[in-house]
Amino acid sequence: MNSRKLFSKLKEESYDVSIFDLMNAKVYLEKDMTYLPEDYKKGYLEDFFTFFPEVLREIKNKTEEEIEDFEIDEEEIKKVDLRLCSMGSKKMGRNSYEKLVKTVINYLIFINKRPLHALTTRFPGGKQIIEKNGNYYCPIKNAQSNELSICEFCICKDLNEL
């Protein structure tokens, strides 16, 4: 698939994500994170619901002409979408969460080539993604052995490579 074609599709999808979807997605994620430590959960939710709406705005404000023209393996897009659909529980708000995440994550992976988490996100142990000389380094990149993880698609390198 052509990058501009994918971007055009994602831009169209970005307009389908409403304020109600954002609210439902937040309720969904809060419930899905019930058993995580409160301070970690609070920080993650703040970062997520600052970062993802910012990326949605970015998608809406860009034009197709601003997107570099290149080919993207459609099988990779399908793999990402399948993983995103498999993550988390099937609680109320799931559809809103999926709509938001599929649009933003596909944009970050295939079009914008940026980390999938905000640079301010604190991971267990208090570590964050580090940007150095145009490269991103993640403290959990190689720690994710879950077959449903989408880390393998993220542009970040492992923090140990720094």
Curated annotation (Swiss-Prot):
Q: A Pfam family this protein belongs to? A: DUF2115
Specify the superkingdom: Archaea
* InterPro entries cross-referenced by the UniProt entry: DUF2115 (IPR019215)
- Family, per entry: Belongs to the UPF0305 family.
Which HAMAP family does the record cross-reference, listed alphabetically?
A: UPF0305
What protein name applies here?
UPF0305 protein MmarC7_1691
Traced from the root, the source organism's taxonomic lineage reads: Archaea, Methanobacteriati, Methanobacteriota, Methanomada group, Methanococci
